[in-house]
């Protein structure tokens, strides 16, 4: 059972939880309820205390707020957040002075934070799909001397799993570099424009990585801008392969094919990753690497796919123009497009079952 709140903390909690907007700024500052140039507000969300403040303009979990307060050496907020129920052990992730370490010990912090706990914090922050979550993760985790090697190994596995095919991870890679690439990819995936600007300002060597992320996440407008306006380019067949690594990417596949990419190579890449939507879209565009694709599928153990690729039932979709290069025209063309050849194999499968 948690200890009862002190009278002082109870008053602060009451003030911070009120919806009244007329409380004087000086009173809030006196009560340590003014943070990042804005009133600090508390509210409950599914049984957990959330903090509203000026930090990134977003709501944050109480335990995450504690990590930030520790990083800022804000003694009063460390005490307040801990008494309100934040896990004081989370403070170990951002302690940077002896005085704060001593304070956290007095409040009950352990000597070390378990790797599992660090991993949970990382996932807790990234679960909130906002620009602020990316920026917040960067501020807490980048070049953090408190991270243990075991956690670094867990994080490498997570990044490899979530960016499968987009990124190659070697044991010699710097964790900070992998983290930046992971955050940038998530920012592109979910259109976190503020996070992209934040990372672009801090890191000047991400242009090629940005191009690859646009291909991977089917972002045709952004791809067009970076390729034609900013002139950031790589080999068109490499671009097409990147577009095929993640399934259901018709926009960027078509775009790269229209630039001159090899559609048979794209088809084989799609087979390798078992991306069914991409395979049959490549056939719609004229791909005909059936024998080679069947062999790759057989080697991978994709037996039905191997069999289906050598059926003499496919042909390119004559309704698809193959020379569009304007992203708006391509988007309009494919907005409600249903793959001709995917429909053929689905009908075939239905009939034999």
Swiss-Prot record:
GO annotation (BP), single: taxis
One matching Pfam family: ASFV_360
InterPro entries documented for this protein: ASFV_MGF360
Role description: Plays a role in virus cell tropism, and may be required for efficient virus replication in macrophages.
Family: Belongs to the asfivirus MGF 360 family.
Name listed for the protein in its UniProt record: Protein MGF 360-13L
Organism expressing this protein natively: African swine fever virus (isolate Tick/Malawi/Lil 20-1/1983) (ASFV)
